[in-house]
């Protein structure tokens, strides 16, 4: 019986290489804006970002994200993560509004769609709204970090 539990423990345990993946990334001094209306998703995402020393500020809808972006100093955020389906203002409209703003970083700041939608038409809409790329839900931590590294390091 002891062997069964030991084997089950080996199968279910997280490999050491997986445990230390965050050590490969350090986003100290980088600040992200996360627009996400689902509190659980926001909490998980914040945990991923904080694990690699990134600062994160949250907005629970597109309008709040747009307001935060517009009311902060120029170049305050290094990246924006945008859920697409939110109340009040969706992520598509928020991204278009950010891109259309008069702030000097409006055309350059990386805006990444965070969505479960993986259809080709959804990807086209993401790019039409001015977003750089799409990260699918559920978010895979390693892919998130690689994408962040691509845009802000």
Predicted regions and their residues:
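C-terminal compact regulatory domains
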Residues: 3-153
């Amino acid at each position: 019986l002891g062997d069964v539990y030991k084997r089950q423990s080996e199968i279910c345990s997280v490999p050491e290489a997986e445990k230390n993946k965050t050590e490969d990334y350090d986003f100290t001094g980088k600040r992200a804006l996360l627009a996400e209306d689902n509190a659980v998703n926001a909490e998980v995402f914040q945990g991923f970002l904080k694990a690699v020393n990134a600062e994160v500020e949250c907005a629970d809808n597109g309008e709040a994200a747009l307001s935060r972006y517009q009311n902060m100093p120029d170049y305050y955020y290094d990246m924006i993560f945008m859920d697409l389906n939110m109340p009040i203002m969706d992520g598509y409209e928020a991204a278009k509004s950010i891109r259309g703003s008069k702030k000097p970083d409006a055309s350059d700041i990386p805006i990444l769609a965070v969505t479960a939608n993986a259809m080709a038409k959804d990807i086209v809409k993401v790019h039409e709204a001015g977003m750089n790329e799409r990260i699918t839900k559920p978010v895979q931590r390693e892919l998130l970090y690689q994408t962040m590294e691509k845009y802000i390091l």
